């Protein structure tokens, strides 16, 4: 497991006074004001001075960022927080996405299907992306209890029901062609 968790990404500047668009990845975006944030290398530290909601993101003022040029230089900077600064998972069905990366993907019989590559949220719920064991293009599954009935982080695996994969499900009218 990683000792730092990706918690937000800085977007483009907002206005001319150094504010930035901020895309938060946690359940409580306002908690970003409490966390010790760093860039990916851990060398640069950030403190959120103010945070307000916008359409599909937040607008943040970061300590030491006073103008648009300074804000622009931070565009696409990922913000990380130390794992020990985050709350523990509340139940067995709560995970940090970082803990799922690299887990073995198995079917219900235990056959290896691939490896977890990424988690995505396109607006309709989390989607799991995995690399197939035999190579080829990555596959996507909805990250639901029906499609992913077992998540065993300590055991290094997840169990999936492959026929819930939209990429492998034929269209409803496929047999009418």
Curated annotation (Swiss-Prot):
Q: Name one Pfam family in it.
A: PRC_RimM
> Where is it mainly found?
cytoplasm
Q: Which keywords does UniProt give here?
A: Chaperone, Cytoplasm, Ribosome biogenesis, rRNA processing
Q: Which InterPro entries match?
A: PRC_barrel-like_sf, PRC_RimM, RimM, RimM_N, RimM_N_sf, Transl_B-barrel_sf
Residue ranges occupied by any PRC barrel domain in the UniProt entry = 92-166
**UniProt-listed GO biological process terms:** ribosomal small subunit biogenesis; rRNA processing
List localization entries: Cytoplasm
Q: Does the keyword RNA-binding apply?
A: no
Q: Name one GO molecular function term.
A: ribosome binding
One Gene Ontology cellular component annotation held by this UniProt entry: ribosome
The record comments on the domains as follows: The PRC barrel domain binds ribosomal protein uS19.
Q: Which HAMAP family match?
A: Ribosome_mat_RimM
- Tell me the subunit arrangement: Binds ribosomal protein uS19.
Which PANTHER family would you find in this protein's record? RIBOSOME MATURATION FACTOR RIMM
Give the protein's biological function: An accessory protein needed during the final step in the assembly of 30S ribosomal subunit, possibly for assembly of the head region. Essential for efficient processing of 16S rRNA. May be needed both before and after RbfA during the maturation of 16S rRNA. It has affinity for free ribosomal 30S subunits but not for 70S ribosomes.
Q: Mind telling me what this protein is named? A: Ribosome maturation factor RimM
């Amino acid at each position: 497991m990683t000792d730092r968790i990706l918690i937000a990404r800085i977007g483009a500047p907002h206005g001319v006074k150094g504010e930035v668009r901020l895309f938060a990845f946690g359940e409580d975006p306002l908690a970003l004001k409490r966390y010790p944030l760093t860039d990916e290398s851990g060398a640069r530290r950030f403190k959120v001075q103010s945070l307000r909601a916008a359409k599909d993101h937040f607008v943040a003022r970061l300590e030491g960022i006073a103008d648009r040029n300074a804000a622009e230089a931070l565009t696409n900077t990922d913000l990380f927080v130390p794992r020990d600064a985050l709350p523990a998972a509340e139940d067995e069905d709560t995970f940090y996405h970082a803990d799922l990366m690299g887990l073995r993907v198995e079917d219900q019989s235990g056959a290896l299907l691939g490896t977890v590559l990424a988690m995505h949220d396109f607006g309709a719920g989390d989607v799991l992306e995995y690399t197939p064991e035999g190579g080829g293009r990555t596959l996507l599954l909805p990250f639901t209890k029906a499609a992913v009935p077992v998540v065993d982080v300590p055991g290094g695996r997840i169990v999936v029901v492959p026929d819930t994969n939209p990429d492998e499900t034929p269209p409803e009218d496929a047999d009418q062609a």
